[in-house]
Swiss-Prot record:
GO biological process terms on file: ribosomal large subunit biogenesis; translation
Protein name, entry field: Large ribosomal subunit protein eL14
Record gene name: rpl14e
CDD domains, per the entry: eL14
GO cellular component terms attached to this protein's record: cytosolic large ribosomal subunit
Statement: the UniProt record of this protein carries the keyword Aminoacyl-tRNA synthetase: no
InterPro entries xrefs: Rib_uL2_dom2, Ribosomal_eL14, Ribosomal_eL14_arc, Translation_prot_SH3-like_sf
Family label: Belongs to the eukaryotic ribosomal protein eL14 family.
One Gene Ontology molecular-function label: RNA binding
This protein's UniProt keywords: Ribonucleoprotein, Ribosomal protein
Taxonomic lineage: Archaea, Thermoproteota, Thermoprotei, Sulfolobales, Sulfolobaceae
Cited PANTHER family: 60S RIBOSOMAL PROTEIN L14, LARGE RIBOSOMAL SUBUNIT PROTEIN EL14
């Protein structure tokens, strides 16, 4: 089970969307993936993200590589994960 794969639900840990959940839609290269919220569910816009800024969860939805936001939204609703996707995670910054 690879951690970074199409359909994997992740939490963004860096940036203005830190704490929001997103879905990996496409793997661009070894360092970057394409993610989406979709925006109306979790607030994450479709964009390229460094994999070091993501924390994978144990949940995965069955989508095709490059799926549209509508397809992702439908699969999230079918899996019953809408409320899970709307939850925000509190990111803890380690202190020295």
């Amino acid at each position: 089970m690879p951690a970074i794969e199409v359909g994997r639900i992740c939490v963004k840990v860096k940036g203005r969307e830190a704490g929001s959940k997103c879905v990996i839609v496409d793997i661009i290269d070894d360092n970057f993936v394409l993610v989406t919220g979709p925006k109306d569910i979790s607030g994450v816009k479709r964009r390229r993200v460094n994999i070091l800024h993501l924390e994978p969860t144990d949940k995965k939805i069955d989508i095709q590589k490059g799926a549209s936001d509508e397809e992702v939204r439908k699969k999230i609703e079918e899996a019953g994960l809408t409320e899970y996707m709307k939850e925000r995670i509190k990111i803890k910054i380690p202190t020295l």
